């Protein structure tokens, strides 16, 4: 399938979290919004059609995952990572990364435990840690030779204070 990644889409004044919050967050409107994982490509026509078809139904209750969802997950895991997963093992397939990390933190830690997160990072990770009653331990990433790297000395020093989990994203 060919796709047009070159046509710019103006998302200003569309209630876009990425493009319409710069004054609120940064106090200026000339910021290049690389702070949120949001793509600026037009949605693929097949996705638009599927959403429109579902939206045409008058009731928006909770839905169940259908077999095509599980087939897509199993196919992706096999193609991308070379391993096969049984359908039964996907019974608890979380709906997103933040949800999955939240469940993991609740299983591996208890309120009051220390959780280390490298900075800068994705804002919802911090909220997930603190709203769950865990103590956020920030460790700075270091900009070196044009890329971010870990400050292992800082991480080791902070881990010695009783950090239970290091969240990498």
Which residues does each predicted region cover?
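N-terminal small-domain helix-loop-helix segment of the aminotransferase-like
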Residues: 2-96
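Conserved core of the PLP fold type I
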Residues: 60-169
């Amino acid at each position: 399938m060919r796709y047009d990644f070159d046509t710019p889409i103006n998302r200003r004044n569309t209630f876009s979290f990425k493009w319409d919050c710069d004054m609120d967050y940064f106090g200026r409107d000339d910021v290049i919004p690389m702070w949120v994982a949001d793509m600026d490509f037009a949605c693929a026509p097949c996705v638009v059609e599927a959403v429109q078809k579902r939206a045409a139904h008058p009731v928006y209750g909770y839905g169940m995952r259908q077999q095509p969802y599980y087939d897509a997950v199993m196919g992706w895991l096999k193609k991308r990572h070379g391993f096969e997963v049984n359908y039964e093992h996907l019974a608890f397939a979380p709906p997103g990364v933040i949800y999955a990390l939240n469940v993991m933190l609740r299983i591996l830690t208890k309120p009051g435990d220390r959780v280390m997160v490298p900075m800068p990072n994705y804002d919802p990770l911090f909220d997930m840690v603190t709203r769950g009653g865990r103590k956020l331990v920030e460790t700075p990433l270091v900009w070196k030779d044009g890329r971010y790297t870990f400050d292992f000395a800082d991480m080791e020093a902070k881990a010695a204070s009783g950090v239970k989990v290091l969240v990498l994203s």
